[in-house]
Amino acid sequence: MTTHLTLTEDDGIRPDIDDRDVATLIPDAVTAVLDTAGTWLGWDGRPILRDGNAWTPHKALRRVADHLLDHLTEIECRLAGRPTVPDHWHGRRVTTDADFARFTEVDLDEATSRLTRLAACYQARLGGLPAQTLDARPDEATWTIREVVHHVSNVTYYADMVGRLTAP
């Protein structure tokens, strides 16, 4: 049996795009996330309440990794001509017990390793794609790959929900 929350969050608004190289958007966003995460060592264990949710360092990094992975699989499926698999997990809406764990140097090191490797996958995959592929719209309801990448580059939102906790 599969169970999941049935919340939907499709506002139908396409993300803004600009002329930045899509291959650099995710690595730049990950660098910004990790810069903020570096200030979370010594977090006091209390969740930060922002934008209708409880946020912790672990939850923010979980959401960044989930978001990067979800959309990377979407892009890969589309480029392979395969149907995408809808995401029924609404991880932003829940805070797990694991999200309340202490945030240590080891956690930052793990996040750095994981997120920089995901960013490298985006850079490698997107770097050689022609504009025609990046801007193809399979149907009116589907975002272009360029729009997806610009959307994903906003993963800095999750780190911003925790914010900078100490001086770097």
Model regions and ranges:
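Aromatic-glycine hotspot motif
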Residues: 1-168
